Design a protein with these regions (language model features):
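Short helix-loop "hinge" at the ATP-lid/N-box region of the Bergerat-fold HATPase_c
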Residues: 46-47
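Short beta-strand/loop element within the Bergerat-fold HATPase_c
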Residues: 53-65
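Conserved micro-motifs of the catalytic ATP-binding
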Residues: 27-30
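Short conserved segment of the HATPase_c
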Residues: 78-92
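Conserved glycine-rich
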Residues: 119-120
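Short conserved segments within the C-terminal catalytic ATPase subdomain
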Residues: 11-25
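Acidic ATP/Mg2+-coordinating residue in the GHKL
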Residues: 73
Length: 148
């Protein structure tokens, strides 16, 4: 699925002269449509906020019970005081970012909801003026599926 997302986002990345890299692979049992949207939203944000000519890295690693998905960009970073607020619908750091980068302010809220639906979490792992790494931890078997 990660290759499909990156293929779908390749035109946007090429338009912004951003290289897309993906490393790793793992299996998560859950909604393919929702998991696609989760990764798409994270990678699209990374492309949108990265500087032209930079790189967006997607890495997927596997543990016994969880899959860890990291999306690293080379954008302006997220100040510490906003690292939880960014997952709220329509939240914007400032209006100028909204005009400059576009979007409706729903992407990260959807990522949060999709991760939670699958029994996972999402957080800002690291962030500075040199970029941000978003970390999603998903159980290999979706909580939504095991409850049925």
């Amino acid at each position: 699925m990660s290759e499909e997302v990156l293929t779908d986002l390749a035109p946007l990345a090429e338009n912004r002269s951003i290289a897309l890299n993906c490393a790793g692979d793992a299996l998560v049992i859950g909604s393919d449509t929702l998991l696609y949207r989760l990764l798409f939203n994270l990678a699209e944000n990374a492309i949108r906020y990265s500087r032209s000519g930079s790189t967006v890295n997607v890495s997927i690693s596997d543990s016994d019970s969880h899959v860890l998905l990291r999306v690293k960009d080379e954008g302006p970073g997220i100040p510490k005081q906003y690292r939880e607020s960014i997952f709220q619908p329509f939240f914007r750091l400032d209006k100028s970012r909204s005009r400059a980068y576009g979007g409706a302010g729903l992407g990260l809220a959807l990522v949060w909801e999709i991760a939670a639906l699958h029994g996972g979490t999402v957080e800002v792992e690291t962030s500075s003026e040199n970029g941000t790494t978003m970390l999603v931890s998903l159980p290999k078997r979706s909580a939504a599926l095991t409850e049925q």
